[in-house]
Amino acid sequence: MAVLVNGESYSAAEFFAAALREYDAAIVVGEQTTGKGYFQYTYMLPDGSAVGLSTGKYYTPNGVSLAQKGIMPDVMVPVDAETTNAIYAGTLVPEADPQIQAAVKALAEE
């Protein structure tokens, strides 16, 4: 299995990818993740507003914190702004997506 990540992958998404890699269940392909290693709790205030506070820290199954460093992919595949925009617009076909193609190639080589 391959898991695609980038700088928009954070929190539970990056810990999911890290856990799969630590259990040798997946290779990680793409760009470095954000490194948001904390979880928050939202406290409601009497006036109807709210405040979110970090109340804990995530760790991978092997006890590694990704806070402020994220995950470095096994296969690093940076994409330019034009490709990123096409991905988010839904106009990039998988055959032209460099990260998907790198993942397919990496899986074929296993």
Regions found by a protein language model. Give the residues of each.
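Conserved acidic, small-residue-rich alpha-beta core segments centered on
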Residues: 1-88
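C-terminal recognition in membrane/secretory proteostasis and scaffolding
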Residues: 77-110
